[in-house]
Amino acid sequence: MMSAARTVTVGTATAAPGTIVRGAIPVTTLAGGTPLEIPVVVINGARGGPCFWVDGAIHGDEPEGPLACQIAMREIDPAQLAGTVVLVPVMNVPAFEAAQRGNPLDTFSYDMNRIYPGRANGYLTERMAAAHAEAMVANADFEISIHSGGAHSFLDKAIFVDESPASVELATAMGPGWGCIMSSFNPKGSPMAHMKDSGKVGITVELGGRSATSPTEFARVGRELANSILNILRHYTMYPGAAAYPSPRYKGQQEALLAAASGLFLPAPGVGFLTMMTKGDAIARITNIFGDTLAELVAPADGMIFGLRALPNVTTGEWCCFFCKVEGTRD
């Protein structure tokens, strides 16, 4: 039997059943007297059900999450919703304002996605993470954290899970095209890891980045992510309509490929994202300024590319490619 609808409070936002309320999770006050708070939107359904929590911009140079949250907020009708959707468009507000990966106000815990859930009495970013984590764990049943390639790369549809059946189910509910489902490379320090440690479910999803921020491409990426938010609601029978699913679904591990030389990074003709490759297939080459090949990047195993650097100029040791080493299918 469906549970009765209830009033939901997240930070300063208190939403009665059937309403949408904006608010914030308070953190502290900055030196100039400006309050530091994390914005939230609570969409509380007219009927009872679970709480789905969506996080964006834990990295400030990844604006795709905020756009997806905007679209979802416009399109989800609380009168038709069973349960609650909590949208956190921007987790790391100072980083987002500076369009940087981490918090420019914090030297020691710069990257929130490595120190989460932080400490209530810790460095500034740790305090932000702790305030967010307290609110999330108190309310959420399952969560997605939206990422992208940020300022340095483009990442296509890829998901990290903790390999529990519940996390793989949530990943599958992202919908068609989201078949690259990898084991988490970061078992601690992220919202999804904290959700698991709290007996709940979270996943990390990747789509977008520097090569897809032209107006048309950025809008497309935001639309794709919003579609997945709605598809998840349908999968868990929180919203009307039938969910759709990816096929095939792959199981794999991430490997980062780094530059062996400095120069121009030139992907191989026809190389594509989320397309199966054989170990040794050409991914890219690095040339000097005269066009001489200095190094080649090849597939380290059978698998697929899900991320490539956006800047052609490259220095030895810089990141070039994210590769999913496919271990088989999940079907």
Model-derived segments and spans:
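Structured catalytic-domain cores with a bias toward divalent-metal coordination
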Residues: 1-331
